Amino acid sequence: MLDLGNMSMSASVALTCCPSFLPAASGPELAKSINSPENLAGECNGKHLPMIPPEEEVKDIKIANGVTAFTRKQNPSDRVKKGFVLDDHVKDWVKRRVASGVSESTCFLPFLVGAKKMVDCLVCHKPVYPGEDLSCSVRGCQGAYHSLCAKESLGFSKSSKFKCPQHECFVCKQRTQWRCVKCPMAAHDKHSPWSKEILHLKDQPGRAVCWRHPTDWRLDTKHAVAQSEIEEVFCQLPLPYVEEEFKIDLAWKDSVVKEDPPSYVHIRRNIYLVKKKRDNANDGVGCTNCGPNCDRSCVCRVQCISCSKGCSCPESCGNRPFRKEKKIKIVKTEHCGWGVEAAESINKEDFIVEYIGEVISDAQCEQRLWDMKHKGMKDFYMCEIQKDFTIDATFKGNASRFLNHSCNPNCVLEKWQVEGETRVGVFAARQIEAGEPLTYDYRFVQFGPEVKCNCGSENCQGYLGTKRKEPNCLVVSWGAKRRRLFHRPIARKPQQD
């Protein structure tokens, strides 16, 4: 290793000065002479010149043993910078960050004294800065969210009534029965899409693992019964799950083709394609001893006759159906095509809707059936009331044409006389709740192939309608005698001489 100390003591080492070196001057004149253009343009071309501060920054120059030392003047602004505290530096940092385009709310240092404690958003799990937080309105809840996350992911916009998803059922928005310990899901068992797959924690009442976490479904289940067949063993093994949950783009919702009921012309009253018959036998005859409501003992009601002007009851009596229909809606069923559901609760014997369509004769009905057969149509909406009086709702009608058949129906069809006109109404056979399908017994005679019944009732007959019964012919032959199988012995008397 090179020894610099020995080199300095060696006599062979000669120190030479720069040819442009000038004699040392005293005071500020030295700085002027060194920084003069003549000296800077010397033979050294400034390569060997030291870094000399400007003249206005030189405070004092000391020369000792040919070595010149400069003392720099102290700037008053430097004294202020040396007196900076941490808050001043933080403010300066915030100012520079805001100038660069960063939001001032994000310029937040949680380690400072008195700073708010930062929490993570329960949706995106990123820090929530002051001014961007949306806190839960439930007392004692520490949940915090970004305003944007709560609006886009949870659908909340009002900060005053905001609640965490775990405080209410995601379906009925009422107080929850259980909360999931792994996600913000909360619900009741009856509102859960897979209630059997919810794992309720025994040691934590009100806590559970919801259906979103299939890997934990079998934590609390009992072992299955031992099987000897390899096929049964593989059937009981849980399937591997790669995706636990996925989201569907809302744009796909518009691309789904909405299925509508079969097209038909909606009408409010029957359209007669035959001569309209009017029964005038009951004109001028009505109830006389009924009260204002006309209960079941009403003479007109027993005969399925609507009260009219000839009755002594007022216009507001209860035996005037076909005036106000119940609220119903057309829905798509799982096994029976289109059907009708009750949109409100219906009491027993209440009028629901009138069965209307085109009134045709028997000849027209037969012709239409042949035409439908040639066209391949399988759905018929014909209701035969009496001779030459068939209501066909195939092309024109109302929602009653979609009522399905059931072997255990909750509705009945009744034929009434209203102001001398024959009309058919659908009445409730029992109490019907809202959302319950409306059905009645078709009672039709099947002449062609059998049609399977999908009503699902306990007393389902299996097939729609009944076949036409052929009479059993009893063949009687009066000429032939029946052969006896047993002979009774006859006692003979002895002959007398």
Curated annotation (Swiss-Prot):
Keyword Iron-sulfur: no
Tissue: Expressed in roots, flowers and buds, the anther and in stamen filaments.
GO BP term (any one): chromatin organization
PHD-type zinc-finger residues: 118-186
SUPFAM superfamilies listed in its UniProt record: SET domain (SSF82199)
Assembly, per entry: Interacts with AMS/bHLH21 by its SET domain and PHD finger.
Function summary: Histone methyltransferase. Involved in stamen development.
Protein name from the UniProt record: Histone-lysine N-methyltransferase ASHR3
Annotated source species: Arabidopsis thaliana (Mouse-ear cress)
